[in-house]
């Protein structure tokens, strides 16, 4: 129940970027494969899209919104801002 209340963090960076580190609990779907990955995402859930610096996440947000996802945001500044604010990333 608590997990569903939290937004889904969607990482749209490339595989090598994901492997170098990402936000714990995030789901990885590279931007170029987002159209084919839409079926795996819940359109009713809040989704926060992120990338390295914020540009690709904006593009990813538009893809989701065009597909009918209503509660979508882009993480301003991307992973760089996340880490700059002192938040951790993991390697998995």
Language-model-detected regions and their locations in the chain:
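Rhodanese-like catalytic fold shared by cysteine-dependent sulfurtransferases
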Residues: 1-8, 12-92
